[in-house]
Amino acid sequence: MFRWRDPPVIGIALLALAAGFGQFGAVSALGSVAKTFGHLGSGTSFADEAGLSGTTLGVGLAILRLASLGGLPLAGLADRFGRRTILLATCAVGLALTVAAAASPGYWWFVAIFALGRPPLSATNGVSQVAAVELTASSERAKAVALIAAGYGVGAGLTAIVHSLAVNELGFRGIFALAVLPLILLVLIQRWVVEPARYTNLERDTTVERRPVIGPVARAYRGRLAVVALVMFGVSVITGPANSLVFIYAQNIRRVSGIATSGMVVGAGVAGLGGLLAGRWLADHWGRRPTVAAGIAGMAGFGALAYSGSVPGLIGGYILGVAAGSVLAPAGGALANELFPTGVRASVAGWNIAAGVVGAVVGLIEFGILADVHGTGNHAAFAAVITFFPAVAFAALLFFLPETKGREPEDLWHAG
């Protein structure tokens, strides 16, 4: 077993960073994309202020999220061909397609090309957490998952900062072209990425049945998988619009400057680091389930604050929302992986990706339609309240799961 700060875990965190840089480009540059392919009007509707209607943006982002369903079979391939192979292959392909999106001739072309890169990068993110769990013991596991989440967050934050400071020089096309840098760095990162011993031991065990990549999960695991997937669905109903529309809301509607947006992202990065540290401690001392529940409630409340209509509310809500999501990440990542044995763990991660995609699609379309229907005035605030708060109810499902704090996966599933 490795410690959370050993090179194999750091290597996986760097892959998560690269995936975050590639995936978050559509979010951070959405304002520029809307201005390039849309039309800013003089009215006060969402479309006049943003450049494209809330429905158009919501549907476009929903398509990007739906494309992530392709991450389900790709993540499942890690149960057949190994964690290392799939991590490196999916990250490389996803980043290459992100670079290609820079040449998009129109909005729907942009959506189509960028959507092709979503499945491999989603698989990278999902399998990276699986590998981190398998590389570490119980005492190090929440720390390792927190490091993976931090890596993804840093990658996403870098995209947002670069866009905020250099959008006039680079435009959205330049932002996407920068994904070539982490693509090149994969040559160095791959030296640190190793196959977890838990997986290699499973490969040598000829008594273990090899299941189809997207085959049915064994009956003993289906109840837990259904509960975990429903919780992931609820979380994503919140995070889909809360994270995906916040920068176009800041830049095109609230008219926040690039420097202020960068400051908001840096502040969120600091808060996110604090949230990860707090979440890691809470996961190991308070428990996985209550920590996840608290994170869900915080994301909903602070997400609504971010869209409440004022710049201070936007900045404060975004920063605190990132902190709440970071509190959730170590506990949620550990819980979702500790509940299932090694032979199906990557496939389960794929099903969780699918549940998250469906939740995000529901949230994005609901938010976009509500913002358009509400017309003038504080349309985003109305959409946020109606979309976010009901999703908190999914947190109650956590208490149908066993608490995994302080336990090895083998203690929960002897087949693991």
Question: Positions of the model-derived regions?
Answer:
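Central cavity-lining transmembrane alpha-helices of secondary-active solute carriers
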Residues: 59-75, 266-278
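Helix-loop junctions at membrane interfaces in 12-TM secondary transporters
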Residues: 102-113, 169, 307-317
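Glycine-rich segments within core transmembrane alpha-helices of 12-TM secondary carriers
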Residues: 140-167, 352-364
